[in-house]
Each structure stands twice: as C-alpha cells, then as structure tokens.
Amino acid sequence: MIGPINPKTNNGHRFILVAIDYFTKWVEAGSFAHVTQKVVKKFIERDLICRYGPPEKIITDNAQNFNGKMIIELCAKWKIKHSNSSPYRPKMNGAVEAANKNVKKIIQKMVVTYKDWHEMLPFSLHAYRTAVRTSTGATPYTLVYGMEAVMPLEVEIPSLRDRKSVV
C-alpha cells in the first residue's frame, strides 16, 4: 500500500493499494480514499480473482485491514494461503517495495497537478507493465500475455511489426 498521499485527489483518494505477481512482476493497483478490510476484500475479488483466478498464495503486511476476519474468510472461501511479510522489515518484501517505488516515480513524472494523480494511475501501470524488468529480462506484459504490447506511440507512428506484416 502506498500512502497516505498528500494532497489527496479531487475525489478524495489518498491511498494506492498494490498487488504484484512475484514471477511476472505484473502489478495491479487501485486508488482509494480509505483502505479498510472491505476495500481490500473488494480489490482482491474484483481486480485479482475475477481477472486472473484465485492466487495460490498472497503475502500481505501485518496491518489489520489485511488480516481481519473478512480477509481470513475470503482466503478460506477461495482456498488461498495467506501469510504476512516480516514486521518492521520492509526490505524482506523487496519486490513489493520496489514496485511501489517505481509506480510512485512514474506517477510523479506524469501528473499535471498533484490532485490528478489518480487519473494517471492506469497510464503509470501501463508504463510499468511494458518496461523490461532486469530480474526477468522481459516485460510483465509479455510474460502475462505471451506477446509484446502495442505502445500508444505505435498508433501514430507505424512500427516495424506493422511494416513486416504489410510487406
């Protein structure tokens, strides 16, 4: 989780809830005004389970909103193993900390005013997902979808991929 972020957005959002797949480095994230158990449960169901199926395991920090009754019941329902990262040692969960840092940096470079950062979050995620990760030697997009992403710039300027298929 990233936040609280100041200033809060036009719609009152102050937090970014982040999930990362350890193998592909794929990141899912959403912005929220508050991060309660109900918000975390909805995020896991809507943004993770409904898109990719239930994960085998999730690792969260030790905050109550990630470890309460609703989350325990969710994990039991979907047969998800739930464990916690080491308390007071964020470096032990390095992949998440690195992803959080990178997402924050990308958002900071994209925002026009700091109150619109929530509108830049999808674009920031796209930039993160289509950048090569040194740990895998590939982009998260390629590892998840098995193909290269079509970049927004390629819509305006035809890429070599397009030219090869025409010739």
Regions found by a protein language model. Give the residues of each.
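Integrase module of LTR retroelements
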Residues: 1-167
